[in-house]
A protein has these predicted regions:
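Bacterial N-terminal signal peptides
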Residues: 8-19
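Boundary at the C-terminal end of the N-terminal hydrophobic targeting segment
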Residues: 20, 24-27
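A short, Lys/Arg-enriched amphipathic alpha-helix followed by its capping loop at the start of a domain
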Residues: 81-89, 126
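Serine-hydrolase catalytic-loop signature spanning alpha/beta hydrolases and amidase-signature enzymes
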Residues: 72-80, 91
């Protein structure tokens, strides 16, 4: 649990402000919503995990990329990356448990980090693969860091978006006053229920408030529909189960194993929940190369705010590290 909390400490919910969202990539690419194929994998305890995929037909020779969303989100967060990269890679975006078309088990314990990692492993095995490139944003980033650390044999490469290495973030969470203040929303999520009318930054949790950050009107409509199928209490259970204490009196994190595969990190510098200071020293916790891309003007949802930069960089980086 302490190891997972070290990873989960670096997770963030929604950015309070999004500036200059770039939807040009979405405009250039055919929308994937009606083009993807859907499937379900069975995880521990019989929990069904939904995934959407696009790309070459499944085969051992096609590089597999698993995409893991954060809060509040669903598989469609990766629409631009799926559309642009599916010519070369099998792009598989999951709905994390509690969201959209995946199962929504009851109880805080059902959202323990170990189970979230098991969900990703279940999808890879269901697809008949031994390993994949793991991509994660926000809570998906926490799961991705954890997956890479403890299932390195299943991790080809690691791509993280707006989520520092847990050791870097915990350092800031214990000593950086700005970061501590920026993380106060997580305490609200831990102490209130989804039915509280002020739980979501002073507003109720509704499909409309949860999707208010989405700029594209058609995408927002699909987010509202996905959140109508989601469990709001389950969303908060991620925080209740896994988010650790902050401040100088917080217990130090347990040691974490070094990440053994190449890592690509994107960070939108306008993220109002996450200080970029947490990125410092990332290289100390990795065994292989780190590529760090900071994006001025992009916020927490960097894969959408700067989708063209993210997608172009992913293609270059993955092509250099994968073979057909």
């Amino acid at each position: 649990m302490r190891m997972w909390k070290a990873v989960a400490a670096a997770v963030f919910g929604v950015a309070l402000a999004l500036e200059g969202a770039d939807i040009s990539m979405a405009a250039q690419q055919p929308d994937v919503y009606g083009r993807v194929e859907h499937g379900y994998a069975t995880s521990e305890g019989g929990v069904k995990i939904h995934y959407a995929w696009l790309g070459p037909k499944q085969s051992a020779g096609t590089p597999l990329v698993i995409l893991i969303h954060g809060f509040p989100d669903f598989w469609y967060s990766w629409r631009d990356q799926m559309a642009a990269l599916s010519d070369r890679f099998q792009m598989v975006a999951i709905d994390q448990r509690g969201y959209n078309l995946s199962d929504k088990p009851k109880g805080v314990e059902s959202y323990d980090g170990r189970l979230l990692v098991a969900d990703v492993a279940a999808v890879i095995k269901h697809l008949g693969r031994a390993k994949a490139t793991i991509v994660g944003h926000d809570w998906g980033g926490a799961v991705a860091w954890q997956f890479a650390m403890f299932l390195p044999q299943m991790t080809e490469n690691l791509i993280i978006l707006n989520l520092p290495h847990p050791s870097g973030f915990l350092r800031e969470l214990r000593s950086n006053k700005d970061q501590i203040a920026n993380s106060e929303y997580a305490r609200t999520f831990q102490t209130k229920s989804a039915s509280d009318p002020t739980v979501f930054f002073g507003k109720p949790m509704t499909p409309e408030t949860l999707s208010s950050w989405v700029r594209d009107p058609m995408a927002r409509k699909r987010y509202i529909e996905a959140f109508q199928r989601s469990d709001f209490e389950a969303m908060l259970n991620y925080y209740k189960r896994n988010y650790p204490a902050s401040g100088p009196d917080a217990p130090p994190p347990a040691p974490l194993p070094k990440v053994k595969m190449p890592v690509l990190v994107f960070h939108g510098l306008a993220d109002t929940a996450l200080n970029a200071d947490g990125l410092s020293g990332t290289w100390n916790w990795l065994e292989k190369d780190l590529t760090l891309v900071t994006v001025p003007g992009a916020g927490h949802f960097v894969q959408q705010d700067a989708s063209e930069m993210v997608t172009t960089t992913m293609r270059w980086w993955l092509t250099a590290r994968t073979t057909k």
